[in-house]
Regions:
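Active-site/ligand-binding neighborhood in enzyme catalytic cores
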Residues: 1-89
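Mid-domain catalytic core of redox enzymes
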Residues: 86-211
Length: 211
C-alpha cells in the first residue's frame, strides 16, 4: 500500500473487505497473507479491474452435476464408494495402514490418501510423528456462524446495490469476524420471488420466522 501509494481507503474499503469475503477471514488477519500470492490470486480471477462487472460462471444444475458424473466414472472404474461411514482413526503398523470407521471393524490397506483438512488429518492419526504434528497443526482455521434465511433487511437499502456477495461492517465494530451475505438467487438459478440468502457471522438481527 505505502509503496504503491494506494492509500488507506483502498486498503480498508476494497482490498481488506474483498479479500476477507473471498476467504471468510477477519479483515485484520488479511494483512498477514503473503502479498505476492494474494495479488496473483486477484490477477488469476480478474479482480484487479476497477470498472465493469467481473465475469463468473456457474455449472448448469449446480455442483451436483459434476459430483454425480465423477461418482459414475469412479464406479465404472471399479472404485467402491462408501457413504455414512466416517473414519475415526488411521493407524500405521508394519508397513500397512489400519482404518477404523464409526460402527465398523478395522480394515487393513497398503496406503491411505487423506483428503481432509489438516486438523482433521491430525486428529485421525494417533501415532503422528513430531514433524507431522508440527506441519498439520500449523494451519489455522476460522469458525463462522452460517444462517440460511429470507430476510432482505441484511441487504443494502437500495436494491440496485444488491450484489452476489455483500460485505457489511458496523461503524462501531465489536466482532473480529466478517459479516458477509451471499445472495443465492444471483449465484444459483433460484426464482427472484423466493429470496434466499446465506449470511456469515451476522451482527444484526435476522427474523426468526424467515430462517
Amino acid at each position: 500500500r505505502d509503496r504503491l501509494g494506494t492509500g488507506q481507503w483502498f486498503r480498508d474499503y476494497y482490498l481488506l473487505p474483498l479479500s476477507g469475503a473471498i476467504w471468510s477471514t477477519p479483515t485484520q488477519n488479511i494483512l498477514d497473507f503473503p502479498a505476492a500470492a494474494m495479488m496473483q490470486f486477484f490477477e488469476n480471477h480478474a479482480l484487479l479491474n476497477y470498472s465493469g462487472q467481473h465475469q463468473w460462471y456457474t455449472v448448469n444444475g449446480g455442483s451436483i452435476q459434476y459430483v454425480t458424473r465423477l461418482e459414475r466414472e469412479l464406479k465404472i472404474s471399479g472404485v467402491e464408494i462408501r457413504i455414512k461411514a466416517p473414519v475415526t482413526s488411521v493407524q500405521r503398523d508394519a508397513g500397512k495402514v489400519t482404518i477404523t470407521c464409526q460402527g465398523g471393524l478395522p480394515e487393513i490397506y497398503d496406503e491411505v490418501v487423506f483428503a481432509t483438512h489438516s486438523d482433521d488429518s491430525l486428529r485421525l492419526l494417533p501415532d503422528a510423528s513430531k514433524e507431522e504434528s508440527k506441519l498439520l497443526s500449523a494451519i489455522r482455521y476460522q469458525s463462522n456462524d452460517v444462517v440460511l434465511h429470507a430476510d432482505t433487511s441484511v441487504m443494502p437499502r437500495l436494491k440496485q446495490c444488491w450484489s452476489s456477495w455483500v460485505y457489511t461492517e458496523d461503524k462501531h465494530k465489536t466482532s473480529d469476524k466478517i459479516d458477509l451475505t451471499y445472495w443465492m438467487n444471483s449465484l444459483q438459478p433460484i426464482p427472484k420471488e423466493d429470496p434466499l440468502f446465506v449470511t456469515l457471522n451476522c451482527t444484526r438481527n435476522i427474523r426468526e420466522d424467515l430462517i
